[in-house]
């Protein structure tokens, strides 16, 4: 049987028929094998995993996804993408390969540890706060080098300040130490990010939630050449 897929209306009708057909049959509660105490989907050879997806050979993972690289990871919470022998990762994205004790980090990798609010820090870096693009560095705050003793004192002062005078966004939401970066600081519109793929919002919904929205620019290019047949 053939279907005409050139019409959006027809395509939506076909999708509804397919979904109605699927609902007539039992659905497996979880895709996975050799697990103990897990919830979510596509979980394999893991233990104590809660509400997570695409996890493999890992233990004590909560609210995480795409943690599939081997060897597995453990003791991670709100962690998206990668893993590979990662431990104690919290609210971080695209981090992995022997990383440990990361909080609020993005794209930090290759045996880094004890990092907070960092981006693109790699190759064995440790004890960094609010740093970008450092390699084999330690005891830095906002990319500035400190001694071990100075670092400990400054971190204590910074966290105290973040709690006493927190960032407050346009919607009145309070961001103390321990919160991820506010969405309104993102240079991208909600509709330009992967968030729109997983949690779709229309423009009004996004703006109501305090997100940015970017209207696509019109690109009516004039064809100025022809291909001779």
Enumerate the language-model features and the residues they cover.
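Long, distal/terminal scaffolding or interaction modules
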Residues: 1-229
